[in-house]
From Swiss-Prot:
Gene Ontology CC annotations of this record: endoplasmic reticulum; Golgi apparatus; membrane
Composition bias, Low complexity: 447-456
Pfam (any one): DHHC
Stretches assigned to the DHHC domain: 172-222
Keyword ATP-binding: no
UniProt-listed Enzyme Commission number(s): 2.3.1.225
Family matches, as PROSITE patterns: DHHC
Organism encoding this protein: Emericella nidulans (strain FGSC A4 / ATCC 38163 / CBS 112.46 / NRRL 194 / M139)
Residue stretches spanning the membrane: 12-32, 54-74, 217-237, 261-281
Enzymatic reactions: L-cysteinyl-[protein] + hexadecanoyl-CoA = S-hexadecanoyl-L-cysteinyl-[protein] + CoA
MF terms (GO), sorted A to Z: protein-cysteine S-palmitoyltransferase activity
Protein name, entry field: Palmitoyltransferase pfa5
């Protein structure tokens, strides 16, 4: 019961904090421009008794407002993406059908409680609220539509070559949204939706930081850090000059307090740079040293006959074949077909797809990484950063294009896979024919290269053959001349 108010509070704070940040920026602009640059450096007030320093004041203003411009641009781009393109996955109809009766029952219980002074006992609250493990699709007391009845929605996954799966080979399932989740997708409690490559819910930027906004979040952190460091250095320099003037200590202290508060905030936010260098999200980083990823990796066509039952070659891995066969009929007591005239039953299973034996089959090997391995790490921090920030300097500095990792059009996998997946394929013998042919060609070239020391022997054999031909030709000439003389 406490989750709903907390969610509303977090959303309300996420809408208020951006306004507060803009207020802090406006106040810092006033402090740097009027009291420091104009009244102290460019046109000093009589009480300072100091000469005019127009160059220093102008330089500070130029650097300050250039950095401020980048801060505002990146922040506006970030806010727009977080609000209008957070990359949320749509909820399934089954989830909406489950949530509607639950909301009605909660509203009725509230009205009864307010009207008659009845308060729910603790046991009632526990029985009404399902005990769930959202990430593992375990949702007890969640109703008959917690798991799918057919293979609807699985085609998106088994058309890829690699995807993250459960131990049984099916994709990760969200029991709250009632659908399968693409790789690195997590359910956000604040928005009650699944988010692609969710990093964290950040009230400072107004919502969820995900794959569509993580790049702009890093750029905003970077320019804000430069901006705050500039303000901090300027304030430190001129505070040292004004240290003996008691009337100016309070103003300089205010500037230092603001700068230090913002810097302390940025220290926590700058961790995202480290996460991007390791190609991790904040959620994945929680157990990155012990996490074990289960992957479904496509078995190449030339190996399918070898893993069939009755063959001599015994695979060292479990497999799963898509499309999945029809599920067994539901348990007794669970409605399966709507009654005549009652319309659609929200608890009836969808129609079971037809299983044509001639239909194309997709066989996947179920493999697991070692603890602490990251299948999405590309082998170097630069390659990992390029997946978030882009492949050019302009992409790194300007918040224009989206991250390359937000493009999921590849037929290989949802995200670019690293050396860990290549090693798993090699250990399981799942390399494709092209890769095997490439390795054979490489070996052939290497063997030719390694056999180069025997080249002199080849030359000697060629010389022998040449001498043999010359000797045969000379003998034939002598024989013909002798015959002519005779």
């Amino acid at each position: 019961m406490a989750g709903q108010p907390d969610r509303r509070i977090n959303l309300a704070v996420a809408r208020v904090i951006p306004v507060v940040l803009f207020g802090i920026i406006i106040y810092s602009c006033y402090v740097i421009t009027k009291p420091l640059c104009i009244d102290y450096l460019i046109d000093p007030l009589p009480k300072y008794n100091r000469p005019s320093r127009v160059g220093a004041g102008a330089a500070i203003l130029v650097v300050f407002y250039i950095l401020l411009l980048f801060v505002i641009i990146t922040y506006v781009r970030l806010l727009y993406t977080v609000v209008y393109n957070p990359d949320l996955l749509p909820r399934s109809q089954a989830a909406d059908q489950q949530s509607t009766p639950a909301k009605r029952s909660k509203s009725r219980s509230r009205r009864k409680g307010h009207g008659h002074g009845h308060r729910k006992s603790k046991s009632d609250e526990v029985s009404d609220k399902p005990v769930s493990d959202v990430e593992r699709a375990l949702d007890y007391n969640a109703g008959p539509m917690v798991l799918p009845w057919d293979t609807a929605g699985l085609e998106y996954f088994y058309k890829k070559d690699v995807f993250v799966c459960q131990p049984d080979g099916r994709p990760i399932y969200c029991s709250k949204c009632c659908h399968y989740k693409p790789d690195r997708t997590h359910h956000c409690r604040e928005v009650d939706r699944c988010v692609r490559k969710m990093d964290h819910f950040c009230p400072w930027v107004g919502g969820v930081v995900s794959e569509t906004s993580f790049k702009f979040f890093i750029q905003f952190v970077f320019y804000t850090a430069l901006f705050c460091m500039t303000v901090l250095i300027v304030c430190a320099i001129y505070t040292a000059e004004l240290r003996q003037d008691v009337s100016l200590i309070s103003g300089s202290r205010n500037m230092l307090i603001i700068s230090r508060l913002v810097m302390l905030t940025l220290i926590g936010l700058s961790d995202s740079l480290q996460l991007a260098a390791f190609n991790l999200t904040t959620i994945e980083n929680l157990n990155r040293r012990s996490a074990v990823w289960t992957l479904a990796i496509r078995v190449p066509n030339h190996m399918i006959s070898r893993i069939q039952p009755g063959t001599r070659w015994a695979p060292t891995f479990r497999t799963i074949t898509y499309p999945l066969p029809p599920v067994p009929p539901p348990l007794s007591g669970m409605p399966t077909q709507p009654a005549t005239g009652e319309g659609d039953n929200p608890y009836s299973p969808p129609p079971v797809p037809s299983t044509d034996p001639s239909a194309e089959q997709h066989i996947f090997a179920i493999l697991q990484t070692l603890p602490g391995e990251n299948p999405f790490a590309l082998g170097s921090p630069l390659k990992n950063l390029q997946q978030v920030l882009g492949h050019s300097i302009i992409d790194w500095l300007l918040p224009i294009k989206r991250s390359p990792c937000a493009d999921h059009s590849s037929a290989e996998s949802e995200f670019v896979m690293g050396p860990v997946v290549s090693r798993l394929k090699k250990e399981a013998g799942l390399e494709s024919k092209d890769a095997a042919a490439g390795s054979i060609t490489t070996k052939h070239k290497n063997s030719s290269y390694n056999s180069s020391p025997s080249a002199p022997a080849d030359k000697r054999s060629k010389r022998k053959q040449k001498r043999g031909k010359h000797h045969h030709h000379h003998h034939h000439h002598r024989h013909s001349s002798t015959t002519g003389t005779t």
